[in-house]
Amino acid sequence: MYTFKELKRATKQDAVSLPKLKVALLGDTATQLLATAIKGEGILRNYNIELWEAEYNQVERQIMDPTSDYYQFEPDYTIIFHSTHKLLEKHSLVNSNLQSKLADDRLDFVRLLCEQGIGRVIYYNYPEIEDTIWGSYATKVQSSFTYQLTKLNYELMNISQAYPNFFICNLAGISAKYGRNFMFDSSVYVNTEIILSLDALPIISSRTIDIIAAIQGKFKKCLILDLDNTIWGGVVGDDGWENIQVGHGLGIGKAFTEFQEWVKKLKNRGIIIAVCSKNDEGKAKEPFEKNPEMVLKLDDIAVFVANWENKADNIRTIQRTLNIGFDSMVFLDDNPFERNMVREHVSGVTVPELPEDPGDYLEYLYTLNLFETASFSEDDKNRTKQYQIEAKRVSLQQSFTNEAEFLKSLDMVSEVKGFDKFNTPRVAQLSQRSNQFNLRTVRYTEAEIAAIESDLHYATFSFTLADRFGDNGLICVIILEKQDTETLFINTWFMSCRVLKRGMENFTLNTLVDYARSNGFKRIIGEYLPSAKNQMVEGHYPHLGFSKIEGGDNAAKYVLDVETYEEKECYITKK
């Protein structure tokens, strides 16, 4: 975690070469220091934050006036800081009838913000202030500040479910973790109207950029675990599976069990779990297979690597198996030597400095907020199973000397359809997760996908892929923009890397050409815009038979003549 001084210093760095994001910050108290922290954190996380800050206490006026500076700025992200202190001040100035409506009035404004605001909205919820007017009886009094504040925070979560572009930054949770005295300095507040302490600002700005980064497609996908003294106490090779320290009884085993429960919940929400251990593989697997106190089982692990090779090389093996970026991986190990080895030799992997006491693991990891996400779909629950099935495909492929014969043996089937209310969440999520196979690196929210779905200027395609081993779910998305009566532009083409080298690219292009011919279009335009991660598709369009029409060696546009196109061979059947 950076200090505020480091964040302030970062704002002076040259960020012109970084991806630009326009961020509007509006608050009902002084927000200058918060603005500095957010901008600095953004730069240190490789974003060029162009930040517009509203004048003091102008939130409602800026949002409700369509001609305001806020709308002229056209932000990508709108950050709103309504402080608990100002809400308490308002509560103190009105009668009990109006006090009972305090939460509803604020919620009405938030809904208006969701309807009228620009881009994604990040809203800080409300840390608790116990005014002790009613004591504990406040929970029974509708007009009490405690009642209204609790209602407000609860209903904000319901609004976030109703509006896909509305995200809550959990300031109340941060305050609960660090304490009110850490978050707030009364002497500073009365003289400056600044609510948040200098010590709290780095944490809050980090959580804010966590949300932005997740929406932009930068988030952690995989947790790699050491075993001995990391997920259980003791060394299984020396102590045996029956003597490792784990279980719900008193003692250090309880800490390891609760840590495993945390990992299990991460797996259930879609984080890939891998093992990287210096052990004999058979011995390393015994606790998962035989110890009844273990929460984690082998079927929770997508990739299990246990040998006596160095862990840097083993993590590279895991990365190749999963085909994800190193920067989307987290490695946890109790051994400082192993942590430093991975930090030095595997650039990009996040390696937290675990405390010496396993009882402190979870509280420390809670502070890092490693696994921020901007979406969740049913497919996430099956991610570990999908990678385990992929291992079976790889094993089968090794028995074939002819790739075509292998692909035929998979019995692949794809369902092709446009966007609808059922697949919209997964389409939006895949846009946020896809980095390598993403021709223009376009990101979408559910609301944006829904808008495209109903716009006649676009044609939308979603592709699933199933085979003899199982269903990969929705794995490819294409959005065609109808530029004129003869020309289609591939606005968006992204695909899950899990299905590379299956012929899906040929199948999808055949589908696009069929659509173009059926609707009288003569040409399809494709564009490649380079990013830090999509170099693998730099030659995508030439490989498919497109001809370059403009651009240099990197960013370029290509055209495909629909009339002369010959259907490409693939071994995928349309469902």
Model-derived regions, located:
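Alpha-helical cap/lid subdomain in secreted, periplasmic
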Residues: 13-20, 37, 44-54, 60-198, ...
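Acyl-donor binding region in acyl/amide transferases
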Residues: 465-468, 474-551
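Conserved Lys-Pro-Asp/Glu-containing loop-to-beta segment of HAD-superfamily phosphomonoesterases
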Residues: 315-336, 342
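Terminal substrate-recognition subdomain of acyl/acetyltransferases
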Residues: 321, 343, 347-410, 514-575
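Short, acidic loop-to-helix structural element flanking the phosphoryl-transfer center
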Residues: 248-273, 312
